[in-house]
Amino acid sequence: MLAIAFPGIDPVAFELGPIVIRWYALAYLAGFVLGWRYCLALARSTPGRPSAEDYDDFLTWAVVGVILGGRIGYVLFYNLPFYLQNPLDALMVWHGGMSFHGGLIGVLGAILLFCWKRGLSPLAFGDLIAAAAPIGLFFGRIANFINGELYGRPAPDVSWAVVFPRDPLQVPRHPSQLYESFLEGAVLFVLLAILVRMPAVRGRAGMTAGIFFIGYGLSRIIAEFFREPDAQLGFLYAGATMGQLLSVPMVLFGVWLVAQARRRPAAI
């Protein structure tokens, strides 16, 4: 049985007196800061609106949307019976439990409200947010690996399999967090970084966002074949996981966005 020793990385990055700073929190911070800076750089490369100042002002909205939506999404999608019995636990974000799909819904809501107040096109504004999103996904999945959570399915014959300390079975498993970091983070970021600079893509509002939806959805569906499903849910309809079921509408919505964008002439 093959396995790589899990790197003994303390989930706590450092402590400042009574304040404990975890790698997971730093991953969120890195994702927001670097994603924000990337949006500013993209916005400054093209005159007009949405402008860099618009993305500057949106940062707080994005943070609230991701955290609030991510937590509500986890409660609704992944552990609703538990939280119905323990409603106050839903407020205890520090106990863990965030959903990407919930965070996405939260950000979409924030974009719609922000753009309505500013008189901006949600599609054009969302395109640059979509181009930056893989940065946060990359760091978030690395933090999942450091925490030894959301690990993969048993893989006794895979030479790079890892035995995770939090696994009750203590068997070699796919490091699915790293697979997701690579697909949803690195690969998707590079793809979007190339496309968002192409006039035929950048000039069609909604095109970049649509490609992000398709790219993330497909990446997540693939990665879920290697990831252990949540214990309280297991496998659902036709052997699919919750992550896969939530990603299918993402892909379909992305295809629709791209189709609609292709019908519009590029604003070059």
Curated annotation (Swiss-Prot):
| Class of this enzyme | transferase
Instruction: Give the GO cellular component terms, alphabetically.
Output: plasma membrane
Report the protein's function. Catalyzes the transfer of the diacylglyceryl group from phosphatidylglycerol to the sulfhydryl group of the N-terminal cysteine of a prolipoprotein, the first step in the formation of mature lipoproteins.
Q: Has the keyword Signal been applied to this entry?
A: no
What organism does the UniProt record list as the source?
Answer: Azospirillum brasilense
Its annotated compartments are: Cell inner membrane
How does the record say this protein sits in the membrane? Answer: Multi-pass membrane protein
Q: What is this protein called?
A: Phosphatidylglycerol--prolipoprotein diacylglyceryl transferase
Alphabetically ordered keywords of this record: Cell inner membrane, Cell membrane, Membrane, Transferase, Transmembrane, Transmembrane helix
Entry's EC annotation: 2.5.1.145
Q: Which gene encodes it?
A: lgt
Family according to the record: Belongs to the Lgt family.
Gene Ontology molecular functions: phosphatidylglycerol-prolipoprotein diacylglyceryl transferase activity
